[in-house]
Amino acid sequence: MLKGKVFISASAMVTSLGEGVERNFSALLRGEVGVRRVVNPRVSQSPVTAGIIPDSVYDALYERYDRQRTLTLTEIIAVHCISSVLGNRGADGIGLVIASAKGNISLLEGHSAEWTEFHEETGEVAGVVAQHPDSPDSPGAGSALLLGPMARRIASRFGINADDTFVVSNACISGITAVAVARRLILSGRYKEMVVVGVDTQNRFITSGFTSFKSLSDDVCRPYDESRCGLNLGEACGAMLLTTEGDGVCISGAALTDDANHISGPSRTGDGLYFAMRKAMSEAGADNVDMLQMHGTATAYNDEMESKACSLAGLQNVPVQSLKPYFGHTMGASGVIETIIAAEELRNQILAGTPGFETLGVPMPLNISRSNVELPSGKPLRALKTASGFGGTNAALLLEYSTQDGLSCESPVKVNADVLSTVLVESSRILLNDKEVYSLDSGDFQDFIRSAFKTVCGPNMKFYKMDSLSKLGYVASEVLLDGIEYGEEDCGLILSGVYGSLDTDIRHQQIIDTETDASASPAVFVYTLPNVVEGEISIRHHIKGENTWFWSDDRTLSDVREYAALSMSAQDMKYCIVGHIDFLNGRYFAKFELLVRR
């Protein structure tokens, strides 16, 4: 495990409740919610109940930072929050981690047909050379539609190098993942300071997808209540400056796991989330906590699962809250803005109530209240913050508050891992340790991947329902793990790519562009998150260790390999699959390595 503390030295946020940490925290304590009925064509073709940032807030930020409005809505709130936590200081030596579920996906609206004509090798769209790569609307590897280029556009505003910019997209746990990544990189000695950003804005792409799952509530959501009937979406940005020294609130434990059960529904037992909670507490040396800040989406199965995880962890008597009624589910931003609120609650020794809660409606006991709850005074306080999401992902952070001065993190941690085997899939060939194990005389991906599946994989009818990226990862992992045995928590999965789920994003966007939002398919939408390929692999191979997705163009795997070694130490994993995987318009590449810890 990676023992040590990193400190929250500054924070900032923009939500549907307004701009600024103090403003948002004060609103929570008053019971004010930012979720309301919204009629906004940017967000949905029909009215929706959501936490949407007022146009006046965006207008003020554009006036301050970007009067020409060259930045997207997602980018402008990220720029503001980063600027707020950095203040007048320079960015020399600072690392940046940006978390987002869908980033600038709104740029795809009306442009999906252009992307289907994009050819990666030539950079051409339907025979026409693509626009300058910095143009947000330009199809290509430099398009701001992709999270990697989006992050670089933001980082360049502050003089932060691309090599010091990391981008994670782990569905609903993206924000907590980013905090965990930053903490580990600081404890490794690579950085002394890191900025963590979580950001997502709403649009038709997202709302139509969640509507297709019938998971949205027309009323303000009611987490854990017997009358809960679904979630509310939201948009927000939060940023924190994490440092090696400080006082006040620190992060002393972090853990990520996977259910290995289902790509769109949580475990029915709660064991995956429980594993994350247990590991985060163990890493921090904590045997109990003073407050629990859970994901609390107000969907039937999520809230049920969380109650079971709390029971498994023996924390059923600890005061619990969900912040979703205040902000909505802000996706990639949620883990960051909610961690910021948890830090404020520890500092002020008060837990904000969960609006709308009346009668417990989950199978296991939870200590939840709609009113504010005072936390113990005169002692160090601990909070456990959790999240879960599509792909079966789970995450937990352990926060501590103490008035003791002069604390600092421990000495840098050195860890190592060796490459046990390598699989390469491209050009209708599969190579294992440079030896061909399968090939097909066909350039068509679908012909190749179906034939490869029948040859190197066991029977699984669910394979044919997967999107192309998941099929590619499924086959590559089958070859890589052949004959390898491990415990379910002893193996992790850390992948990267340039295009992520873009191929399926295009399919989803084409449906709502050519038809209506109501025509969206849940069978398509579930694959519009890149980490879902990891979920499919985890289900097949019973992998309940860490799952993380990085946006990266590094096919050498040097970055993910270095980070995986840290993850293996933090999570006590013996093995970890690392890889780079891409699929777009029939073109594909997958390189997976199996690492073993020394």
Where do the PLM segments sit?
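Conserved "HGTGT" condensation-loop signature of ketosynthase/thiolase-family condensing enzymes
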Residues: M1-D163, L187, N203, G209-N232, ...
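Glycine-rich, Trp-frequent "lid" loop and neighboring beta-strands that shape
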Residues: V168, C172, K591-L594
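Short conserved active-site loop signatures built around small residues
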Residues: G175
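Active-site histidine-anchored catalytic micro-motif
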Residues: A178
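Internal active-site segments that recognize and position negatively charged phosphoryl groups
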Residues: V181
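Conserved functional loop/turn residues at catalytic and ligand-binding sites
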Residues: R190
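Glycine-/small-residue-rich beta->alpha transition segments that form the dinucleotide
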Residues: D200
